[in-house]
Amino acid sequence: MGMRMMFIMFMLVVLATTVDTFTSDRALDAMNAAASNKASRLIALAVRGCCARAACAGIHQELCGGRR
């Protein structure tokens, strides 16, 4: 193999690795965003449950807007 062919093969490997990494990162970002949204919804449900109980709402007034 000549130097030019080796250089072309090297560039193809670099390009393939870069494209694969870029698409993998985007897929992971989407999965992380979905997990974060799910966690936020679960936390909101827990806070609403706490705010519905007077004892818990009294302890965590900053979460329940100061209401009992």
Swiss-Prot record:
What are the TM regions of this chain, as residue ranges?
Answer: none
Where in the sequence is Glycine amide found? 65
Which named protein is this?
A: Alpha-conotoxin-like Lt1.2
Signal peptide residue numbers? 1-21
Q: Which residues form the propeptide?
A: 22-48
Looking up InterPro entries in the UniProt record yields: Conotoxin_a-typ (IPR009958)
Q: Which GO terms describe its molecular function?
A: acetylcholine receptor inhibitor activity; ion channel regulator activity; toxin activity
For this UniProt record, give its keywords in alphabetical order, as a comma-separated list: Acetylcholine receptor inhibiting toxin, Amidation, Disulfide bond, Ion channel impairing toxin, Neurotoxin, Postsynaptic neurotoxin, Secreted, Signal, Toxin
What is recorded about the domains?
Answer: The cysteine framework is I (CC-C-C). Alpha4/7 pattern.
GO CC annotations on file: extracellular region; host cell postsynaptic membrane
Q: In which tissues is it expressed?
A: Expressed by the venom duct.
Q: Which residues form a coiled coil?
A: none
What is the annotated localization of this protein?
Secreted
According to the UniProt record, where is the region Lacks the Ser-Xaa-Pro motif that is crucial for potent interaction with nAChR?
A: 52-54
The organism named in the record is: Conus litteratus (Lettered cone)
What is this protein for, i.e. what is its function? Alpha-conotoxins act on postsynaptic membranes, they bind to the nicotinic acetylcholine receptors (nAChR) and thus inhibit them. Has a distinct nAChR binding mode from other alpha-conotoxins, due to a different three residue motif (Ala-Xaa-Ala instead of the conserved Ser-Xaa-Pro motif).
Cystine pairs: 50-56, 51-64
